[in-house]
């Protein structure tokens, strides 16, 4: 997860960007997971049962399968922004809260790197293929999985409205503890080594998310 970078001092982040202290319990657990995987690889390196590992640092996965038959189905209150958007648009939720509009960004809202879930799935296939086919150059490798393009929360909301012809009821709320101001990926390493690159646009992805929400509602 990209949360391992914490509040990065230089953007975009590469795989060599230092990991700073996590800004949330979620980010802390992701750092722990990477440490466990790395240590397992190191501990077994000289044994007959040597383990190899690839860590994919996801940025912000969004969207659904283009068929609208597979998508994100949160239990209870969603943890991610796009299900909040689609549930507000469909009428499940009365109002969308945008947490913070006083950040040091162009429109005052946080910047994120939103990647289509189908592109993310393809990154997994590329990583597994690299491992199975013996193309890893190290026993433990790390890849950023994002688009390399920062999009603000407000831009994402506006894009959803424009692409889907839906007007959202939203309000600005106080900042949420643990949210970093901005994070987006340098994906050159994944592009070169995995032969993978994000292909779907934010607009296509938001259209797929809305199609999925309507499918759930039987519309």
List the model feature ranges, each with a label.
Residues 4-60, 69-77:
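Catalytic helix-loop patch of NAD(P)-dependent Rossmann-fold dehydrogenases
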Residues 81-219:
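C-terminal substrate-binding subdomain of Rossmann-fold SDR/epimerase-dehydratase oxidoreductases
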Residues 9-11, 65-70, 110-111, 156:
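Short aromatic-enriched loop/helix-cap "lid" or pocket-rim segments at secondary-structure transitions
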Residues 3-4, 61-64, 120:
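Conserved sequence/active-site signature of Rossmann-fold short-chain dehydrogenase/reductase
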Residues 41-44, 66, 89, 131:
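Short, well-ordered alpha-helical segments in soluble proteins
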Residues 63-65, 102-103:
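Short, basic/glycine-rich phosphate-binding loops at helix/coil junctions
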């Amino acid at each position: 997860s990209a949360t391992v970078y914490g509040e990065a001092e230089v953007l975009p982040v590469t795989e060599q960007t230092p990991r700073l202290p996590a800004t949330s319990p979620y980010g802390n657990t992701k750092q722990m997971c990477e440490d466990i995987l790395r240590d397992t690889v190191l501990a077994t390196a000289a044994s007959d049962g040597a383990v190899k590992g690839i860590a994919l640092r996801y940025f912000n996965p969004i969207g659904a399968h283009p068929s609208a038959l597979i998508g994100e189905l949160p239990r209870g209150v969603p943890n991610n922004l796009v299900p909040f958007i689609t549930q507000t648009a469909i009428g499940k939720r009365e109002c969308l809260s945008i947490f913070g509009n006083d950040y040091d960004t162009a429109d005052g809202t946080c910047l994120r790197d939103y990647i289509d879930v189908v592109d993310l799935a393809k990154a997994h296939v590329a990583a597994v293929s690299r491992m199975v086919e013996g193309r890893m150059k190290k026993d433990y490798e790390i890849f950023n999985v994002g688009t390399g393009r920062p999009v603000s929360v407000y831009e994402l909301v506006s894009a959803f409205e424009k692409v889907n012809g839906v007007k959202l009821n939203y309000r600005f709320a106080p900042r949420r503890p643990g949210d970093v101001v901005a994070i987006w990926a340098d994906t050159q390493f994944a592009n070169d080594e995995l032969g993978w690159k994000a292909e779907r646009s934010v607009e296509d992805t938001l259209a797929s998310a809305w199609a999925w929400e309507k499918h759930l509602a039987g519309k």
